[in-house]
Amino acid sequence: LVEKRPDYKIIANFLLHRIVPLQKYVMPVNPFDDHKDSKSSVTGIKNALLHLSEGYPLGIFPAGEVSTFKDGRLVVDKPWEEGAIKVIRKAQVPVVPIYFHAKNSQLFYFLSKIGDTLRTAKLPSELFSQKDRVIKVRIGKPISVNEQNEYKTIEDYSEFLRKKTYMLANSFNKENKLLTVPNLKPQKSPKKI
């Protein structure tokens, strides 16, 4: 993505911002900051909105953290952060949903059970452990501002964006039937008489 759009940035954990090759692509936020109105949060939101208003692309992970195991099962995401959804809505730009089909190491999920701090500290090494792995990504169609504005409450808007994103996961769970049909030929146009 950054080969095509070197101006692309993501809002991500400040620990990822400390990795030198990633610095120019990460707008850092502090997930441990309990005060949503703190200076670091306000600065991050202002920078994100400025970046978007200048026509540059921005990636946001609305859950604010990586999916983890709970009760032995992979959890999709925790509820998406209201603050992230408000930033997306306030930007008034088309939204492109993206679904990542990937897993982290068993150690990462084990540390998640112990605590958020350990899980977060493991993030940089998890990122580098993906180096030779194939990560499946599905990119959806842009959602227009008009379509977004049909959802009046933040809750409805968040649910709409979440559904649009997780609908992209279905392609990884089903085989494409069209590709398995033998001798599929395009229909001929009817002859004019």
Language model: regions and residue ranges:
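Non-catalytic C-terminal accessory region of glycerolipid acyltransferases
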Residues: 42-193
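Catalytic core of membrane glycerolipid acyltransferases/transacylases, capturing the structured
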Residues: 1-38
